[in-house]
Amino acid sequence: FFSYFDELENETIHGHVYSSAIGGNTANSEYELLTGDSCAFLPTGSVAYQTYINYPVGTLVSTLKDQGYSASLLHPHWSTGWNRIQVYGLFGFDRTLWRESYRAVDTLRGYTTDEWDYEKLIELYEEERAAQADDEGVFIFNITMQNHGGYGYNSFRETVHISGHE
């Protein structure tokens, strides 16, 4: 498994991303990644999507679309959060898929599971790829939900035990 990651590291362009949004306000992390701008200097508690995005701005989305990529968003939670519908339209996404885009999802602690999300991500990629010419690329921005709070939820089964550390 790790040899695959080692190979990816040797064969791809990669780096590190730092986000000034830690422990909440997920939309600010998205904003920083997609725009390259920092939220560190915004007023405390502000969310860029709700306050500052009122017109089209240059983003990773627009840059990739200028290079012939399709641009889709997959977010398996409700579309009503953080003014995302308006913002992602202004960012230039061709297609946005939300929790309400699907009849049923698999959940854990009330949130869509990563497994379900990744299966849909693969389906979306294959669908987008089939619709593209060979020289066109596919960009899909995927926001997962399973890692959101509620960690004390009583539906977890302890399946891994380490001797001497009970």
Regions found by a protein language model. Give the residues of each.
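Solvent-exposed soluble domains appended to multi-pass membrane proteins
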Residues: 1-166
